[in-house]
Each structure stands twice: as structure tokens, then as C-alpha cells.
């Protein structure tokens, strides 16, 4: 099972898991209305799709070769002390971690696949910054032929409208 592969565990209550609905309201509002159990996406699994979904949903960019280049503050790395989030290692520097094996990869791909109706695979590169809080997703995609910069700009400026129109 994919969950076991990426998270290294199993569901405590499989029945509850089967009842859960994925809860990114910007895109799946109708699916979560009235539900009792909503699976809440985390940091990267929220910011990455929000950055590119309007362009994908409106057919402006290719769903192939998407790169999610993300940065987060050290608090996003969890509470467990590790070499990578130890102050002397992180202070005045930053680094990529879990490149090509981060557990949020399939969740981002799942969201973008649902929005596009195609199988989307991404290259996801998270970075840890020496700041207490914050997150940034810069997402790269090839612009489809005939699409203008103005179309991309307008789509991303009016994210909620664009997402609501297609998602």
C-alpha cells in the first residue's frame, strides 16, 4: 500500500480511513461538505498545488516535468532532534533534504492528477531554512503552445476564481 511505502506505518483504523475525504477546500469544497472525517493536507501538500493548480486546471501548462522547489522554516521539519535541524548545522545556511523520496510527493501528485484528469508526476525538492516559520513553493512547468504570459499571469493573479472554474 502506498501509505505504508511512504509513511512507514499502517492505519490504526482502516474503516475510518475509508470514510475520510481529502480536505483541500480550495479544490475539493463540494466533496468535503457535510463529511464527518476530513483528511487535512500538510504544509507542502497545500502550498505546492495552490501554486500551480489554476494553470493546470485551465490547461495553460503541461502536466509533464513539473518541478516543486519548496522551502520551509525549521519548525516544519518536526520536533525530533536530528543532525539536519541542529542549530550549528542549520544556522546561517540551508539545505535540501529527502530529495526524490519525500513522503509528500505522492500526495501532491494525487491532487494535481485529480485536477488535471491526467497522471501527474513531479520532481519535489524540499529545503530547510534557518527561520522559525514560513513556507514557499516555487513551481515550474512548461507553458503549453499558444499560451501567453498574460494568460498565465491573469490565471495566477485570480487563483480562487480560476480554481473554482475548473476544480
Predicted regions, residues:
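Short gly/pro-enriched beta-turn/loop segments at secondary-structure junctions
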Residues: 61, 92, 103, 117, ...
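Oxyanion-binding "anion nests"
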Residues: 105-124
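Short, conserved charged micro-motifs
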Residues: 145-153
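Single conserved hydrophobic/aromatic residue that forms the stacking wall/gate
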Residues: 158-167
Amino acid at each position: 500500500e502506498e501509505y505504508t511505502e511512504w509513511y512507514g506505518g499502517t492505519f490504526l483504523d482502516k474503516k475510518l480511513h475509508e470514510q475520510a475525504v481529502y480536505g483541500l477546500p480550495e479544490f475539493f469544497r463540494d466533496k468535503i461538505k457535510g463529511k464527518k472525517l476530513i483528511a487535512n493536507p500538510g504544509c507542502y501538500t497545500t502550498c505546492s498545488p495552490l501554486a500551480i493548480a489554476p494553470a493546470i486546471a485551465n490547461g495553460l501548462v503541461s502536466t509533464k516535468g513539473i518541478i516543486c522547489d519548496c522551502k520551509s522554516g525549521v519548525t516544519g521539519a518536526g520536533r525530533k532532534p536530528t543532525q539536519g535541524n541542529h542549530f550549528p548545522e542549520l544556522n546561517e545556511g540551508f539545505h535540501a533534504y529527502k530529495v526524490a523520496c519525500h513522503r509528500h510527493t505522492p500526495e501532491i501528485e494525487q491532487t494535481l492528477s485529480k485536477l488535471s484528469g491526467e497522471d501527474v508526476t513531479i520532481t519535489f525538492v524540499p529545503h530547510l531554512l534557518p527561520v522559525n516559520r514560513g513556507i514557499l513553493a516555487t513551481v515550474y512547468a512548461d507553458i503549453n503552445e499558444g499560451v501567453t504570459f498574460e494568460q498565465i499571469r491573469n490565471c495566477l493573479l485570480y487563483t480562487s476564481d480560476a480554481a473554482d472554474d475548473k476544480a
